[in-house]
Amino acid sequence: SVGFKAGVKDYKLTYYTPEYETKPTDILAAFRVTPQPGVPPEEAGAAVAAESSTGTWTTVWTDGLTSLDRYKGRCYHIEPVAGEESQFIAYVAYPLDLFEEGSVTNMFTSIVGNVFGFKALRALRLEDLRIPPAYTKTFQGPPHGIQVERDKLNKYGRPLLGCTIKPKLGLSAKNYGRAVYECLRGGLDFTKDDENVNSQPFMRWRDRFLFCAEAIFKSQAETGEIKGHYLNATAGTCEEMMKRAIFARELGVPIVMHDYLTGGFTANTSLAQYCRDNGLLLHIHRAMHAVIDRQKNHGMHFRVLAKALRMSGGDHIHAGTVVGKLEGEREITLGFVDLLRDDFVEKDRSRGIYFTQDWVSLPGVLPVASGGIHVWHMPALTEIFGDDSVLQFGGGTLGHPWGNAPGAVANRVALEACVQARNEGRDLAREGNEIIRAASKWSPELAAACEVWKEIKFEFPAMDTL
């Protein structure tokens, strides 16, 4: 007789282990599971653990050649989701040895690679990951981090200001460079390539890099401040991406940019390592994130993508605004903003944080607030994001009736007024409008901006609720 029984078996016999004590080296995952009708939650949770680690749908004789106990993922806890019918949070522990060191790509291929198409589940969402120090220590992380960036730029005690150059597509390189120069001269710290500006027929990347570098050095000479423009190095191949980053370094500019989800984690990690070795800051745009994170019951929450970026490497990442035109619930947004910036973040379910996360010494990432924001939002943004952030006003700079430079002046004046008011102990949430009005009395540029945007609001209920 054969030594094992073939045939389909219940996952929960092997992979549901409620008595398991998690190890400090385990990677822990919280999945929101919606089983098909008739599938018990324990079986669904165990199936997730199995299919994202060692399991397959039947017993195979090669199981006898390894130690499943050592390598299997385990579903160790299941709880119903309050207010949702037939949704559960399944907690899964993965042994560290299942993952290649220093590879976000491999971590995601394992944890979310296959299991999301699993038939026994109606839907599946990865809500959070606990990355143990034993694993984070195999990553370089952000090229420089918050403190080193401030030292490089010599800018302290306030959020940094940026602006995405619009119209995003169609400008020639020279006109584009001119728009960059006007914004930087007016008082912004950074300007930005739009995420879809790569190297198109109307503006090839090399021309753009040259004209933007000229704009940076001219505005630096005039203002006495260090300036930057996020030169988008994203390209169709990794080799071409590196070529663009190398050219940026040769021009002597301070920062480049990458679309980390469309470009991919492998490309992003290579670029981040190049940036650290060559003193370039790295701005990360999250184009495509909403495809993955917008649905409440399926996909991956952005806090997981944010943690992955901190491991793969980036000095800035877009993180929603809480107040502008794009998605972002306040407490949840602040939860992943802290996961990006802080060394140690306590578990706090009210902010969507399922696990205590200890980053040890991995550098932090500056969150970027961008999308439909303008001068009237400045007090709220200063209050919500604090000093360690980048506030980006695209239309909110370039839409100024007098042009880009006055638009930049208006934003800088508004920001300095808010920071000063906060440092004097005033309550930005309550007195914000008053602070902006007072500042606009002595800044005609700000007064004009206040007039243009006084009525504009983007008010829709947020999808991203707990």
Swiss-Prot record:
Swiss-Prot/TrEMBL cofactor(s): Mg(2+)
Residue numbers carrying N6,N6,N6-trimethyllysine: 5
Subcellular location: Plastid, Chloroplast
UniProt binding sites for substrate: 114, 164, 168, 286, 318, 370
GO molecular function: magnesium ion binding; monooxygenase activity; ribulose-bisphosphate carboxylase activity
Catalytic activity: 2 (2R)-3-phosphoglycerate + 2 H(+) = D-ribulose 1,5-bisphosphate + CO2 + H2O; D-ribulose 1,5-bisphosphate + O2 = 2-phosphoglycolate + (2R)-3-phosphoglycerate + 2 H(+)
Role according to the record: RuBisCO catalyzes two reactions: the carboxylation of D-ribulose 1,5-bisphosphate, the primary event in carbon dioxide fixation, as well as the oxidative fragmentation of the pentose substrate in the photorespiration process. Both reactions occur simultaneously and in competition at the same active site.
Family that this chain belongs to: Belongs to the RuBisCO large chain family. Type I subfamily.
Leftover remarks: The basic functional RuBisCO is composed of a large chain homodimer in a 'head-to-tail' conformation. In form I RuBisCO this homodimer is arranged in a barrel-like tetramer with the small subunits forming a tetrameric 'cap' on each end of the 'barrel'.
Subunit note: Heterohexadecamer of 8 large chains and 8 small chains; disulfide-linked. The disulfide link is formed within the large subunit homodimers.
Protein name: Ribulose bisphosphate carboxylase large chain
Organism encoding this protein: Vitis aestivalis
